[in-house]
């Protein structure tokens, strides 16, 4: 409880927010099998066994991922908020399959969702809202909020669902390990370029010291979109959106899901994505 008192003493919660102490959950995970590996049984959390993903599933470069997005918006007239809602729901669904509430040590399981300033952060806000509906207790840290109606609305939706927002990031990994059972990395997406600046440099440094598992949305934050990890965070769960990116070939965590079941068949054919068949009405597909 000393760590919790220290955290509360720092005034890390925004007004009206509450945090619960949740014992740490070991997050050191063995390297997962290759994404094209055949179906295999799986025990404990993680939902259904991994499917048989075709070896031809395409891993996109940054340029290809941007081109697909542009066509979705321009040619197919999808709106940003529409795709964000579908992506965020996919992320929450993948998390619920990898870490079912019944497999966690506390009820409801406490989850910290860290959101960046762009669309990846918006996906995280939507994900947090659905996690609340799925039986988790999310808390959001959103240090750089865009002054745009879409993101303001997403924040309001979360607040109306009694999802607390932190005023500051817990400064030590052990505090996060004590308070949460899972951290969702919704900081940077595939369009990120350049050096990581504050406050996100410090945030990623803290995340790198966690023992609780990290679930990264689309790209593990701090990774090069094509080359992969350069000594940054090591997520336990990766949720690729639309199609996997080239950096995902360097992913060694336990769970890799594909989400975002919204790609029109003609667009999939044009870019030769060769996406795997989603089962029944599922919005996610387990690649690993």
Swiss-Prot record:
Catalysis performed (reactions): (6R)-NADHX = (6S)-NADHX; (6R)-NADPHX = (6S)-NADPHX
Q: How is the cofactor bound?
A: Binds 1 potassium ion per subunit.
According to its UniProt record, which protein family does this protein belong to?
Belongs to the NnrE/AIBP family.
Its quaternary organisation is: Homodimer. Interacts with APOA1 and APOA2.
Q: Name one GO molecular function term.
A: nucleotide binding
Which region of this protein is its transit peptide?
1-48
The encoding gene:
NAXE
Ranges for the YjeF N-terminal domain? 65-275
* Residues that, per the record, bind (6S)-NADPHX: 119-123, 189-195, 218
EC assignment: the record states: 5.1.99.6
Alphabetized HAMAP family for the sequence: NADHX_epimerase (MF_01966)
Species, as recorded: Canis lupus familiaris (Dog)
Q: Name one GO cellular component term.
A: mitochondrion
Coarsely, its chief localization is mitochondrion
Q: Where is this chain's protein located in or outside the cell? A: Mitochondrion; Secreted
The record describes its post-translational modification as:
Undergoes physiological phosphorylation during sperm capacitation, downstream to PKA activation.
Physiological role: Catalyzes the epimerization of the S- and R-forms of NAD(P)HX, a damaged form of NAD(P)H that is a result of enzymatic or heat-dependent hydration. This is a prerequisite for the S-specific NAD(P)H-hydrate dehydratase to allow the repair of both epimers of NAD(P)HX. Accelerates cholesterol efflux from endothelial cells to high-density lipoprotein (HDL) and thereby regulates angiogenesis.
Q: Where does K(+) bind?
A: 120, 185, 221
**Protein name, UniProt field:** NAD(P)H-hydrate epimerase
Biological process according to GO: lipid transport; membrane raft distribution; negative regulation of angiogenesis; nicotinamide nucleotide metabolic process; regulation of cholesterol efflux; sprouting angiogenesis
């Amino acid at each position: 409880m000393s760590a919790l008192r220290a955290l509360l003493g720092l005034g890390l919660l925004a007004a009206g927010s509450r945090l619960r102490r949740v014992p740490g959950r070991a997050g050191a995970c063995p390297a997962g099998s290759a994404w094209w590996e055949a179906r295999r049984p799986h025990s404990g959390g993680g939902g259904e066994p991994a499917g048989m993903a075709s070896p031809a599933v395409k891993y996109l470069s940054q340029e290809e991922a941007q081109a697909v997005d542009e066509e979705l918006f321009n040619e197919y007239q999808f709106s940003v908020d529409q795709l964000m809602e579908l992506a965020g729901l996919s992320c929450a669904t993948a998390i619920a399959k990898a870490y079912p509430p019944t497999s966690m040590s506390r009820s409801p399981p406490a989850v910290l969702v860290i959101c960046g300033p762009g669309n990846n952060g918006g996906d995280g806000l939507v994900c947090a809202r659905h996690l609340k509906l799925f039986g988790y207790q999310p808390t959001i840290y959103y240090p750089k909020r865009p002054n745009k109606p879409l993101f303001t609305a997403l924040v309001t939706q979360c607040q109306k669902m009694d999802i607390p927002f932190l005023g500051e990031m817990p400064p030590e990994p052990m505090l996060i390990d004590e308070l949460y059972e899972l951290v969702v990395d919704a900081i940077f997406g595939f369009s990120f370029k350049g050096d990581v600046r504050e406050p996100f440099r410090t945030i990623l440094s803290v995340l790198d010291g966690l023992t609780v598992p990290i679930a990264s949305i689309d790209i593990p934050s701090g990774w090069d979109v094509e080359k992969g990890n350069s000594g940054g965070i090591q997520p336990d769960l990766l949720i690729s959106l639309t199609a996997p990116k080239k950096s995902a070939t360097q992913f060694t965590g336990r769970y890799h899901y594909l989400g975002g079941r919204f790609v029109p068949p003609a667009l999939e054919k044009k870019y030769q994505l060769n996406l795997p068949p989603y089962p029944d009405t599922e919005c996610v597909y387990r690649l690993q």
